Amino acid sequence: MKQFMLVKTFDALFAELSDKARTRPAGSGTVAALDAGVHGIGKKILEEAGEVWLAAEHEGDEALAEEISQLLYWTQVLMVSRGLTLDDVYRKL
């Protein structure tokens, strides 16, 4: 029997993060990050961007994909924090 991996899309992640920002579940790391503000989120983005670069230079594709996923997460947290929507970004692509 084939097993299927559940895949979270960029849009689904954004919806999940937006929901957490709205409902503020106790113990949520996303809520804690939002409460840390733009400065704290920005520091995480810089950290993750560096880790993406290092993974691209020195690690395999699996590690690189994981680091990119973390950078995308933090970028979306910043978007939610600033009130940007996916459409705001899509218009710039």
Curated annotation (Swiss-Prot):
Annotated Gene3D superfamilies: MazG-like
Keyword Hydrolase listed: yes
EC number(s) stated in the UniProt entry for this protein: 3.6.1.31
Any Pfam family hit: PRA-PH
Enzyme class: hydrolase
Pathway the protein acts in: Amino-acid biosynthesis; L-histidine biosynthesis; L-histidine from 5-phospho-alpha-D-ribose 1-diphosphate: step 2/9
Reactions performed catalytically: 1-(5-phospho-beta-D-ribosyl)-ATP + H2O = 1-(5-phospho-beta-D-ribosyl)-5'-AMP + diphosphate + H(+)
Any one biological process term the GO annotation gives: L-histidine biosynthetic process
Organism superkingdom: Bacteria
Database matches in SUPFAM superfamilies: all-alpha NTP pyrophosphatases (SSF101386)
Keywords: Amino-acid biosynthesis, ATP-binding, Cytoplasm, Histidine biosynthesis, Hydrolase, Nucleotide-binding
NCBIfam families reported for this sequence: histidine_hisI, PRK00400.1-1
Family membership: Belongs to the PRA-PH family.
Protein name: Phosphoribosyl-ATP pyrophosphatase
Organism: Mycolicibacterium smegmatis (strain ATCC 700084 / mc(2)155)
